[in-house]
């Protein structure tokens, strides 16, 4: 089948199979004109992307990616779709560092900001990390240090083909939700935040068609994170099973707090918050929201029996200095090596 055939099917409201979606993604990256790319993305958006199409496109993106295979298992990622209603501190990034400090092997996938003031690459770059590290260096870092950062444009060069059409369309497309599903290290334990509560069960079901063993897909009342200000909708994925539930701050041993209490700012301001949290200098809601999300990552890594226990282990990682040591290894390697001597 040609790309035109896929466009016609989607335009006529016909859902694409997993393998057809995978092949369509391959054609978008290799042979499509900008008009064809825009036509298929628009047709899928108008029809409504199914979990099977999402999983198939994710497979296609993985096929085109520069991948790594760190000798650590399970591999954890904390990556959200972005595009939520709030500009907060960098929650998933800070949570990844704390989870690694607690013993999880973290393959953090991220990018520069698109919709917010500060994306994961923005804040880590300001903090001193080499966010443009090549795949072999990231693989070695994960094996050696238990954490590495994979910048999306470095690991997904094929995405250049769709940048122009996506900008011209000016609307959300299937690519807005694929980032967390296309970890180049093949992370098999994930905490995925989504901007729309309706996507929680959809991505949960999509993950059962991908090589992910355990995951939490979360939406925190307007946030693509586990929230403190209100309930969080969760789809928990274990193998082929998806269970849905809600949780609150109190259900995982934390105090509720207004969303304004975790507001972020510029990359420089968010980097200061990140440093303050991992060193234990920052307390209150900003620390607590990191504990919530790091606790979830520790849980999916199999290091805790439930999220509340994961929260306790995240707090211990901060209080013992393990999170700080991980931060220094990732973001301030000269400082870390000096302290070790």
UniProtKB/Swiss-Prot annotation:
Note on how the cofactor is bound: Binds 2 magnesium ions per monomer.
Binding-site residues for anthranilate 2, renumbered to this chain: 166
Pathway: Amino-acid biosynthesis; L-tryptophan biosynthesis; L-tryptophan from chorismate: step 2/5
Assembly and oligomerization: Homodimer.
Protein name per UniProt: Anthranilate phosphoribosyltransferase
HAMAP family for the chain: TrpD
Task performed by this protein: Catalyzes the transfer of the phosphoribosyl group of 5-phosphorylribose-1-pyrophosphate (PRPP) to anthranilate to yield N-(5'-phosphoribosyl)-anthranilate (PRA).
Catalytic reactions of this protein: N-(5-phospho-beta-D-ribosyl)anthranilate + diphosphate = 5-phospho-alpha-D-ribose 1-diphosphate + anthranilate
Principal EC category: transferase
Species this protein is from: Haloquadratum walsbyi (strain DSM 16790 / HBSQ001)
Cofactor(s), by name: Mg(2+)
Record-level Gene Ontology MF annotations: anthranilate phosphoribosyltransferase activity; magnesium ion binding
Entry EC no(s): 2.4.2.18
Keyword Acetylation: no
Protein's gene: trpD
GO cellular component: cytosol
């Amino acid at each position: 089948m040609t790309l035109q055939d896929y466009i016609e099917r989607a335009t006529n409201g016909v859902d694409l199979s997993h393998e057809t979606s995978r092949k369509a993604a391959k054609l978008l990256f290799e042979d499509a004109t900008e008009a064809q790319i825009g036509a298929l993305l628009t047709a899928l958006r108008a029809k409504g992307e199914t979990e099977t199409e999402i999983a198939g496109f994710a497979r296609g993106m993985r096929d085109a990616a520069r991948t790594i295979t760190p000798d650590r298992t399970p591999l954890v990622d904390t990556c959200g779709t972005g595009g939520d209603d709030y500009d907060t501190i960098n929650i998933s990034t800070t949570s990844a560092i704390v989870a690694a400090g607690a013993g999880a092997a973290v393959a953090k996938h991220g990018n520069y900001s698109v919709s917010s003031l500060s994306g994961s690459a923005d804040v880590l770059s300001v903090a001193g990390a080499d966010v443009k590290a090549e795949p072999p260096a990231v693989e070695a870092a994960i094996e050696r240090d238990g954490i590495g950062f994979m910048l999306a444009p470095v690991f997904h060069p094929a995405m250049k083909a769709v940048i122009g059409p996506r900008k011209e369309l000016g609307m959300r497309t299937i690519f807005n939700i694929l980032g967390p599903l296309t970890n180049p290290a093949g992370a098999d334990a994930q905490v995925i935040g989504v901007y729309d509560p309706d996507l929680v069960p959809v991505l949960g079901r999509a993950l059962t068609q991908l090589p992910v063993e355990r995951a939490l897909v979360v939406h925190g009342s307007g946030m693509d994170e586990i929230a403190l200000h209100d309930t969080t909708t969760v789809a928990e994925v274990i193998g082929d099973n998806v269970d849905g539930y809600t949780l609150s701050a109190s259900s995982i041993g934390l105090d509720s707090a207004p969303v304004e209490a975790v507001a972020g700012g510029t990359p420089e301001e968010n980097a200061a918050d990140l440093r303050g949290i991992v060193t234990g200098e920052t307390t209150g809601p900003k620390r607590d929201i990191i504990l919530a999300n790091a606790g979830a990552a520790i849980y999916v890594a199999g290091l805790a029996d439930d999220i509340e226990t994961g929260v306790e282990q995240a707090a211990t990682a901060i209080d013992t200095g393990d999170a700080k040591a991980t931060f220094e290894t990732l973001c301030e390697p000269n400082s870390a090596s000096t302290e070790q001597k």
